[in-house]
Amino acid sequence: MAIKLQTVGIIAADMGKTLGFYRTLGLPIPEGLDNEFNVDYETPDGPVMGFLTEAAANQAVPSYTLPDGQSMSLQFRVNSPKEVDDLYTKLIAAGYESYSVPRDAFWGQRFGRVKDPDGRIVNIYAHLTTQN
C-alpha cells in the first residue's frame, strides 16, 4: 500500500482571521475567500491546506467543537536564519501572539514560534548551515 499526506485540515473559528494569518505568514492564498465555509489552498510543493469553519465542521459532525490545547504544530521552512527573524517580526508587528522568540537550537536550526488566531503553534525555521 502506498500512502501520501494529501491534506492538512485546519478548523477556523473565524475564516477571515485565520486566512489573514497564513497570508501574513507568506502563503499566497487568494483574497475574497474570507467568508467561505471551506477553502482549499494547494501548496506548490506539498499537501493541500484545507481550511474549514467551525460551523461547517458542525454540519459534518454535529457535536464538533474546537479542541482545547495543542495537538499538533505546523512547521514552515524559510531560506535563512535572517528570514526566520524577519518573518517572526512581521507576524508580531501584525498583532499575532508570540509563542517563543527565534533562537538557535542545538539540532542545527534557528526557529521561532507564533500562534495563529485559533491558538495553534506555527513554527518558522531555517537550517543554520546550508542543507536541503
Tell me what each language-model feature is.
Residues T18-R23, L91, D116-G119:
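Conserved active-site tyrosine of GNAT-family acetyltransferases
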Residues A13-G16, K82:
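A generic structural signal for alpha-helix starts
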Residues M1-T7, L27-K115, A126-N132:
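Vicinal oxygen chelate
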Residues R120-I124:
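Short, conserved beta-strand/loop elements in beta-sheet-dominated catalytic cores
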Residues Q6, D14, G20-Y22:
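N-terminal functional modules and adjacent low-complexity/disordered segments of proteins
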